[in-house]
Amino acid sequence: ASIPNNLTDFYNQAFYTLYQRHDASKSGYKRELKAKLTPEEFRNILAYIGLKTFFEGKVDFDRTTLDDIITKYCLKNNFELKTNDIVYDATHSACMMLQEGVSLKFSHRSFQEYFAAVGINQLDDKLQRQILVKWSEADRNNISSHRTFMNALFTIQKERTFKNLCIPIIESMDEKYRRMGDITERISTCFKCFICSKDSRENKLELGFLLKNEVYFYYS
């Protein structure tokens, strides 16, 4: 098999390989799939689960939560699915999820972030922008702390990510800056401190600064 060019291709290839793989037996016996879904159909369900759990900040979730998610997915897409079948296929056949007692989670946090990116790509621009902006504003560290999600998002839908996340962030900063009064207010609002140091080699002064956290977010 060819080596993927980026992590997004790796996760995509890993999913299709695991979902369609055969047991390591000479007879080539294929793993049982209880939900009887095509790879694309099952990928879409995982994307919806990833979308819902990621943006709700849930790494672990119980069967009731998953049942609610699958019920909503079925209503939206005119599907009839059993949660038990999805859990079995996700944990035993595709190995995309782990079950520990009554708790479920993606087999790796990066898989959850990848499927969340796939899921949000399936939304229209208005809803996608609403979710992404709310997520970025809820915690200023969200963007820098979820590199897999951001990398997948830019790989899957670069232009839409600029449109629905980057530009709104810039517009928000511009609006806040315009609402500020004189230069004194702008300095006190944006800068934590200024740092003056001397470059002994060139015998000159250098001026640096630290941005306040709420402003640094827009440049991180």
Labelled PLM ranges:
Residues 1-104, 109-111, 119-127, 131-147:
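Extended hydrophobic
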Residues 50, 117-220:
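Hydrophobic repeat-domain scaffold segments
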